[in-house]
């Protein structure tokens, strides 16, 4: 809501928040009100936009803000190519349900005082999922505000088509926890459920991120590792290394949900975008097959009027293991038309050339001692300087 921007602006004399609030009021509020299905509507309820507005707070341009920001509590990394209107924007998240502090303190209060504070139906089960937009045009998408969530509604990593213990329910995380508690009894540990970020590095335009989320998958799957490593340089491209390790054999899947429809190419897929087409290629340590399908997501906007629905179409491209595997690595590569990026994968090493730089990404064997596979990144700039990163 706009009122939140104005409250932050007034409370902290924050000119950035004031600029955002004014921008939404002038450019987007009328359109949102016209499209809203909630009665009586957002304009009759906009009292706080008036009460919290402080005209003495001066707007401040965004140019002095960083292009990368990591929010530790949520395990959320947000990236921008610039603060211009045509900027590319990317975010990825991996953490405890509701955030680390809420998860930790909620269980403490439940144990000490017997009060159940958990209500996570608005918190999406989307560890390692990501969102990308360019110049205000969305590439990836998700289910939005949907009452009952399915595993492939987000750009997550699936094991035998599953992500959590429960699915097709309103509160996926807490329903899954209830099932887990029934199975494990007193052995259930809240600390072992959810995900965490094991590495974040931002050096200039280079951003590297690694999240681990094996804890959310059903116990009987015996997942030892489900990791995603992100590498990007100023959002001129982005790469994922998706890593699966288990004591059992499974079919693993990487999901790519998008607004534009993917078009098959000789190598990979092309996504037509007004702001510049995107090329998508997947390499894997084991044979794969792909599936394309549409998801029709129907959301009830308010329980007061359940016939007022929001319908969303998601184009899904799923890359799956061809046969069950105990371990498998997928490299996902996103490059842009006109960038002349070159991508190949040889002997387990992903090799990308872009803007005169060379990026080499390798994944080693699973290390039971640390609970994950070693990942190494080598970046050579302008054919000379080389930097190495252990992730």
Regions found by a protein language model. Name each.
Residues 1-391:
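Extended polysaccharide-engagement surfaces of secreted carbohydrate-active enzymes
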